[in-house]
Amino acid sequence: SVQHQDVLIIGAGISGIGAACHLKRECPNKSIVILERRHAVGGTWDLFRYPGIRSDSDMYTFGFNFKPWTEARVLADGDSIRGYVRKTAEEYGVDQKIRFGRKVVTANWSSADNLWHVAAVNDATGETEQYTANFLLGCSGYYNYDAGFRPEFPGEADFQGQIVHPQFWPENLDYAGKKVVIIGSGATAITLVPNMTDKAAHVSMLQRSPTYTLSVPAIDPVSKAL
């Protein structure tokens, strides 16, 4: 059978939850369903668990305008952001609108009936569920959750150590007393380096092009005063 909703949202991360909350506030009579492939709220902030994961933007502008960020830290850690998203979803009741374990496989607009036709696989049953909706919001982000970018390096098969991608950080990875090389100097690398130095014997960063790094306070005195 085909399930119809006024609005279908793909993804229960910060964008999907934010969109659902806005709809709940502004259009309370509209039916909403969130299709989430994974089994947890939070998207990126639930998936990524590497040491020191935090926001790259200040939370006062990154957070929701209808539920302002109230913690003192401007650049919040991943656990705090995940908790913030989950608490917001619960407070506005949109957590009850989420259908976990649904992988959207097709989404097609039909001009004949002016509806979106969406197919999603239920990973618990293996069955493909059919949905129609007046509006479809894609809030799945830009990461490939199955396979983050992973270049192959010549000679890596001869390397006797462990190669780790931050997107798939092993829960019990033990790097204490080991020499670590971090390839790249983007936001993830800048976060990883200082958070690995306490345990690792030595941490080196390799970068292709020089960059500028500016240390900013974790707590903004102006925001704190306000």
Language model features with spans:
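Short, flexible, glycine/charge-rich loop motifs used to bind or transfer phosphoryl groups or to couple energy/partner
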Residues: 22-23, 52, 95, 106-107, ...
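FAD-dinucleotide binding site
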Residues: 2-4, 26-29, 47-48, 57, ...
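Rossmann-like dinucleotide-binding core of oxidoreductases
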Residues: 2-4, 8-9, 14, 18-21, ...
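Solvent-exposed beta-strand sheet faces enriched in polar/charged residues
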Residues: 35, 99-101, 206
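Conserved beta-strand scaffold positions in the cores of enzyme catalytic domains, especially
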Residues: 61, 98-99, 161-164
